Amino acid sequence: MAMARLGSWLGEAQWLALVSLFVAALATVGLYLAQWALARARPQPQRRAVEPGEGPRPGSDALLSWILTLGSWRSQWQAAWVTALNEEAERKGGPPFLSFEEDPRQQALELVVQEVSSVLRSAEEKVVVCHVVGQAIQFLVSETPALGAGCRLYDMRLSPFHLQLEFHMKEKREDLQISWSFISVPEMAVNIQPKALGEDQVAETSAMSDVLKDILKHLAGSASPSVVLITKPTTVKEAQNLQCAASTAQESCPPKPPRAHELKLLVRNIHVLLLSEPGASGHINAVCVVQLNDPVQRFSSTLTKNTPDLMWEEEFTFELNAKSKELHLQISEAGRSSEGLLATATVPLDLFKKQPSGPQSFTLTSGSACGSSVLGSVTAEFSYMEPGELKSWPIPPPVPAAKIEKDRTVMPCGTVVTTVTAVKTKPRVDVGRASPLSSDSPVKTPIKVKVIEKDISVQAIACRSAPVSKTLSSSDTELLVLNGSDPVAEVAIRQLSESSKLKLKSPRKKSTIIISGISKTSLSQDHDAALMQGYTASVDSTHQEDAPSHPERAAASAPPEEAESAQASLAPKPQEDELDSWDLEKEPQAAAWSSQVLLDPDGDELSESSMSVLEPGTAKKHKGGILRKGAKLFFRRRHQQKDPGMSQSHNDLVFLEQPEGSRRKGITLTRILNKKLLSRHRNKNTMNGAPVEPCT
């Protein structure tokens, strides 16, 4: 019994549990259905068209401002607006019939983003609307009153202008469509100025201006231009793959011609010929403006007076790219902005064929789109420069240079020793460069001469004999120095030694200085003037003069490894009747330096004090051919008689105040002594069989 009751209670409890679970399931399903029904019955929220109260969006403003600064946008949107205006004007019809063109003088515009709003059209498309403001925009408007009538050209300027831009972005699309519409605001000013205004158009200008303003505002407001920009993202790996593929293709293919952006266009020698004087009468200053459409580059020439024949020789270089299609040449009046345009010409560019090339002529018109009158012609020279092509400038041939050093030293006895050293530098010929003109070329290049004159220095020199010594200066100039044999020669040698110590920048080889003769000259004023002319002539001359060979040349020849031999020297030639002047020997033609040694124009008369320099013992110690290479010595008395109009030293003035008798007396005594010393020295050298050496 008990077991039966227990089984019935368990069955009832199980049944109650199953019923409870079923009721709970029904309640859950009912609650879900009720919520679904309520959700369906609830009204959906409306889509927001504009969000004015959200405040500024710096992120969106920066992004849109960056998009509006892209070169692809700047190069397309003005042309797209002009196309839309022409389509709207053609759809509207006329008269008047209007057509729009881009103004070549228009600079790149900066659009300022002011308000940004977002509108969600669908799940795959999003539209961003923004309000932008520009400073000013210009168009060229050609107006035809009736079909077949003459065209009139106007400048239309909107400042400032307001646009509403819409950016249409779609999912899974790689392009961005930008469309905009013109917003007419009260503060916008519309300026319309006719071009080439004649006297018969003055009365019609004000009447047509108001009519055109209304028409242009209506056309600008109804036109709907648009531009499509490609926005394809590229990863770093894709960019590297593209570069590798391009390099592989270039290795397998022959070298390609230079790209458009690597070319440069050179425009020069612009010649303008105007048929008549356009515009108002009067004197004007014409200027030529050359402008490239893309990338925008603008160059202006110098001012030219108002003449029918205008010429500009300036050179203008333009950077090119694949979008460089037109080059505008504008002749305008300086000082006037828009109404100063006199004539314009458009030059089409074909970068693939590199045309135009060379001198080309184009017609100058008023710039309107429909058949305007021809105002003249313009001729210019065009050339394309490839990368790596340098502008070829004429390189002048190397010019030999001659440096002349004049050094004066005053000895204690009053004798002035003047050393004139002439050094000619041959031009250096580098490997791979054009060689200079040779010596036997019919075209001779003048020698550049640099004269260096040092101040007078006073030196006390003892007259004692010493052996010959050899010195080597820092400039690799070999000097054979004779100490004490002759005070005058010693002074000259010391001057040459000091001048040779100047270190050269790039010494090539060893040079040798030869002093082949020493002579005293007593010159009058007439001979002074003659030597001055000879000094000038020797600087300008590039030819060598023939002269008899000197007997002492063999004893003082240069080393065989030297390519440049010694120059000639001075040799005294006393005359019986007139010993006041001593003739100077000319240089032999064998001198390899091909330059003349200059004479000292400041020769003096010898006075009686010259005996302190000349001693018989000194004259006996001369050795033939002591010194080496290219210097001539001229020495004189310190007291000289110059032209009173020339610069005089204190001693010169003292000498001029001396009486004539004392000077003649000193000259006579000097003649006698020099004559005796010269004959004695020559006789001794002849007996010993030595070559004759000039006596000092």
From Swiss-Prot:
One GO term describing the cellular component: cytosol
In-chain residues carrying the UniProt-annotated modification Phosphothreonine: T445
Membrane-spanning intervals of the chain: 13-33
Domain SMP-LBD: 51-242
Membrane topology recorded in Swiss-Prot or TrEMBL: Single-pass membrane protein
InterPro entries in the cross-refs: C2_dom (IPR000008), C2_domain_sf (IPR035892), C2CD2/C2CD2L (IPR039934), SMP_C2CD2L (IPR040885)
Residue stretches making up the C2 domain: 245-362
SUPFAM superfamilies, per database record: C2 domain (Calcium/lipid-binding domain, CaLB)
Chief place of localization: membrane
Start and end residues of each stretch annotated as Disordered: 539-580
Keyword terms of this UniProt record: Membrane, Phosphoprotein, Transmembrane, Transmembrane helix
Domain of life: Eukaryota
Keyword Acetylation set for record: no
UniProt feature, compositional bias: Basic and acidic residues: 542-553
Listed Low complexity bias regions: 554-572
Keyword Ligase: no
Name of the protein: C2 domain-containing protein 2
Recorded name of the encoding gene: C2CD2
